[in-house]
Structures are given as C-alpha cells and as structure tokens.
Amino acid sequence: MSSYANHQALAGLTLGKSTDYRDTYDASLLQGVPRSLNRDPLGLKADNLPFHGTDIWTLYELSWLNAKGLPQVAVGHVELDYTSANLIESKSFKLYLNSFNQTRFNNWDEVRQTLERDLSTCAQGKVSVALYRLDELEGQPIGHFNGTCIDDQDITIDNYEFTTDYLENATSGEKVVEETLVSHLLKSNCLITHQPDWGSIQIQYRGRQIDREKLLRYLVSFRHHNEFHEQCVERIFNDLLRFCQPEKLSVYARYTRRGGLDINPWRSNSDFVPSTTRLVRQ
C-alpha cells in the first residue's frame, strides 16, 4: 500500500463509491488529486522537478448534442502538463464527460473550449484539448513502442511486492550506451479500488548500461503496487534516475482504457517526443 493511500485529500473522491450518472453538463463532477501526494515522499519539489512531460488522455466515449439536438460524437485528445498542481481522477473525468451527453452546444469548438477550461481549473495547470471526427481517425494503424523488448527472459520470479532493491548495482561498466527498452508486463493497481491497471512502458536512456533482468524484475514488482498511472511513471523515472544515474532519461507508459478513457503519462529530462498512436491493447 502507498504511504498516502489514506490521505484526507483522497477521502472526498467518488472513486470506489456508488454514484449517480448525470447527463446534463456539470463541471463540479471533476475531481483533482494533488500531485504532491506521491511527489513529496519521493523528495520531488514542484519548483525543482527533474523532468518535464504530460499526461496524455484519449477520450473514446465523448458525445453531446448540437444546437438542433442532434447527437455528436468525437474522440478527444487531452494533454495535461506535469506542472499542474493536480492530476485528474479518472472516474470523475468519466462522470464529467457523461454530463455532456444530453447537453446542447453551439459548435465543436465550444465543446473543446469547455473541456479545456474545466480541466485546467480542476488541474490548476495548463491543459490542451483536441477533438477528432471519426473519419479523421479511420484507418489509423495500430502503433508500437520502438525499442528492444525485455520481456522474453527465461527467469524465475516469485516476488511481486514493490521494491527498488533490484535497481541496486543495476548498471555495469564505464561505457556509455544509448538505448530504448520496452516492456508490456507493467501492471499496477488503482490506489483506491485496487483494480488492475495494465500498461506498456518505454524507457529511453543514455548512460551506463542497465541490466535488463534487474530492470524487468523491478517493473514486475509493481504487480501488487497501488498507485495511479501518473504516479507510477514518476516513481519509475525517479528510481531509475536515482539508482542508475543516466545522463538522459525518458519514461513513457501507455495504459489500457477503462471507462472509455486511456491514460498515457510520460516524463523526460531530454528532448523526448512521444508517439501518440494507440498500441495494440488500446
């Protein structure tokens, strides 16, 4: 269990509680979670973060009524800046989007502006929103993470409790390498409900070579760990930076969708540009 799982800031969340679904617009449904909850225990300070990045959300179940009452549908792309005070809690995001269902808007841009305004207010930070018509995305190929997959290792694992022990002495030699490693075995659990979160992760770095077996064992140790997606990515970035001390580091995870939403956080201290094409499990 995370050290802050019972923090009072989480007590008012609708997550894990029975809730009514509203289909008329209500911005008050959105709920934020302070990023400081997991950053403080990691020693990460808002004015001196070792990374930049965004939380990329894909909205697959977005619908509203036009001015004449005809339903509209879109796929939304949301980017929430890492400097925001709060992350957006996903169940509240789903409930908020449902409140658009029977609400009339004059045009698509009014919907986009409404989303951008409300999400920025909840997050207390910069948010950008783009809406796509379905025909704009039809035929879009399934993407993949570039890099070397480390999953096919003939190793025995019998411990699934989170630990950084595997990263102790995980680098070797003095030669500096630059490589991208990928795993599809990332699995953590919701901080509140403990429902499983499934993801693929891409780790791009420059520095002393990281032992792939130790890295895989470390990633598998998240299997019983309870944290939100964004928090896991920041924890992984911080742990790799601390124990492996790469010159450059980027960590990008793309999680499977739940409730019509997928969350894809990335953190980097270099000029990393994430691919936004959905992966095969998304």
UniProtKB/Swiss-Prot annotation:
Q: In which pathway does it act?
A: tRNA modification; tRNA-queuosine biosynthesis
UniProt-listed Enzyme Commission number(s): 1.7.1.13
User: Sorted alphabetically, which Pfam families does this protein's record hold?
Assistant: QueF, QueF_N
* Residues involved in substrate binding: 88-90, 229-230
Keywords of this entry: Cytoplasm, NADP, Oxidoreductase, Queuosine biosynthesis
User: Binding residues for NADPH, per the UniProt record?
Assistant: 90-91, 258-259
Tell me a GO biological process for this protein: tRNA modification
Q: Reaction catalysed by this chain?
A: 7-aminomethyl-7-carbaguanine + 2 NADP(+) = 7-cyano-7-deazaguanine + 2 NADPH + 3 H(+)
SUPFAM superfamilies associated with the record:
Tetrahydrobiopterin biosynthesis enzymes-like (SSF55620)
Quote the catalytic residue positions. 190 (thioimide intermediate), 197 (proton donor)
EC top class named in words? oxidoreductase
Which InterPro entries does the record match to this protein? GTP-CH-I_C/QueF (IPR043133), NADPH_dep_7-cyano-7-deazaG_red (IPR050084), QueF (IPR029500), QueF_N (IPR029139), QueF_type2 (IPR016428)
Protein's cellular compartments = Cytoplasm
Report the GO molecular function annotations: preQ1 synthase activity
GO cellular component: a single term: cytoplasm
Physiological role: Catalyzes the NADPH-dependent reduction of 7-cyano-7-deazaguanine (preQ0) to 7-aminomethyl-7-deazaguanine (preQ1).
**Family to which this protein belongs:** Belongs to the GTP cyclohydrolase I family. QueF type 2 subfamily.
Could you give the subunit structure recorded for this chain?
Homodimer.
- What HAMAP family does the record point to? QueF_type2
Record protein name field:
NADPH-dependent 7-cyano-7-deazaguanine reductase
Which species expresses this protein natively?
Escherichia coli (strain SMS-3-5 / SECEC)
